[in-house]
Amino acid sequence: MIETDRETFTALADDGPAIVRVAADLDIDVAPLTAYDALVADADDHAFLLESAEKTPASDPDGAFTPDTTTEETRHARYSFVGYDPAAVVTVDPDDTTITRLRDDPITDLLDAPDHATGDVLDRLRSVMPAVPRRNIPTEDRQLLDGGLVGFLAYDAVYDLWLDEVGVERPPTPLPDAEFAVTTRTLVFDRATDSVSLVCTPVADADTATDVYDALEAEAKRVQAVLRDATAPATAGIEVTTERAGDRDAYTDAVETAATAVRDGEVYQAVVSRTRELDGDIDPRALYDALRAVNPSPYMFLLAHGDHTVVGASPETLVAVHDDTVVTNPIAGTCQRGASPVADRRLAGEMLADEKERAEHTMLVDLARNDVRRVSAPGTVSVPEFMRVLKYSHVQHIESTVTGTLAADADAFDATRAAFPAGTLSGAPKVRAMEHIDAIEATPRGIYGGGVGYFSWTGDAELAITIRSGTITHTGDEDTLTVRAGAGVVADSDPDAEYEETEAKMDGVLAAVDRLRTTDDGEAVHR
């Protein structure tokens, strides 16, 4: 069952401690969400599901989208990851870093570093990474998450990274700056080979190799047995008792304030966001399943972290580091979907012909190029894709791709710092735009506008921008779902149009809620 035999594993661990990657092929036929449900059961305080969903006719009831097999539509869609039973959780708060051990695992003995409480949030995450060799890592045709840190970087980390040094006082923030599970067991679904494997990255040395291998064999057999008997969970409804959409006038006033700052030469653009909140009985797994159906996206995520769960369908890469390549994916320019392919093309053409949209997008691509250049070798930054229109369930976006070759003295944490936050979620110049956001927006952003993803043991990393998402806070007998969206404000922005843009960007999550909404007596309501 395990691809690496016992003798080879023992030899790899002989002069350890080392992180040794092993994989077991599983003979199962279950969907990733079913596997997630079966493996985490009632112990899902910390677990994750990361997927890349292709768009299908079933996800587009108006028939406006016909899927194809071009690179831009399938580039993310090969792997799904289910992480369960993490060894520990790393929580980075403004003044502290906490490592909470969740089970007996040798890797937890390697997590404490002398400097894990110093530096900024990304320095502190880096310091947690075990300073031991990584062995048995495939070099070709592999997924890039081989265990590591999986979680979120909240937008509010900007105070630690950028705003503290310019004297902006940090407000109370609802969530940690970062929270990442230390993952050594990951279920990997590979669509290209139609296979499922359990990838484990245990710590072993000469004294422990035999026992570690025995435990891996037992875990692979246990997981296969659990998943062979797994069935898709019944779809839970969502009962919403209270909704708060915020004050429209307050938002349009905030947009006008930002536009005035642009006209006064303070910034070129600022992204102003607003929040909707729904209280009630909200099942995160049901919401994820519905969101995947109505808004399949390159980055689908279900991230359970104790008293809060993040569910999302992001189209946009914050930063990716694969081997020595840095990638970011600025998206700026939004229009509605049409009711037919002809209407889609008309709306997309109007968007591409709009001078404001083109200028805004070009500015943000230039900002992304500058971000990537900060951590890239000289002369390696390029824009292989510029101003392409991609379609999603409720909107169309103008997208570009910026790449560079990672400098020899930089790593994935440096690349994340350079890209964070995305210019498409802050504005330009970044720091000055963030100062205005702090002054204009009524509440801290929390996870919205940050990043969700992973830092692999291998040095690879990939984080999506946390947009088209919702954070479910579990408090007592009731849950609160917070959905947030923003619009880029320039000198001639129409406040009412920007408000409608935020509504369109929230539509994916809210449509998923409506798909599951029930009445007080449990009857389904579909609107």
UniProtKB/Swiss-Prot annotation:
Q: Which UniProt keywords apply?
A: Amino-acid biosynthesis, Aromatic amino acid biosynthesis, Lyase, Magnesium, Metal-binding, Tryptophan biosynthesis
Q: Which residues are involved in binding chorismate?
A: G333, T334, Y448, R468, G486, A487, G488
Question: Which annotated residues bind Mg(2+)?
Answer: E360, E501
Does the UniProt entry include the keyword Lyase?
A: yes
Q: Give an example GO biological process.
A: L-tryptophan biosynthetic process
Q: According to the UniProt record, where is the region Disordered?
A: 53-72
Any single Pfam family the record assigns to this protein: Anth_synt_I_N
Q: In which pathway does it act?
A: Amino-acid biosynthesis; L-tryptophan biosynthesis; L-tryptophan from chorismate: step 1/5
MF term (GO), any: anthranilate synthase activity
Q: Oligomeric state and partners?
A: Tetramer of two components I and two components II.
Q: What else is known?
A: Component I catalyzes the formation of anthranilate using ammonia rather than glutamine, whereas component II provides glutamine amidotransferase activity.
Q: Please give the NCBIfam families that the UniProt record associates with this protein.
A: TrpE-arch (TIGR01820)
Annotated protein name in UniProt: Anthranilate synthase component 1 1
- Which organism does this sequence originate in? Halobacterium salinarum (strain ATCC 700922 / JCM 11081 / NRC-1) (Halobacterium halobium)
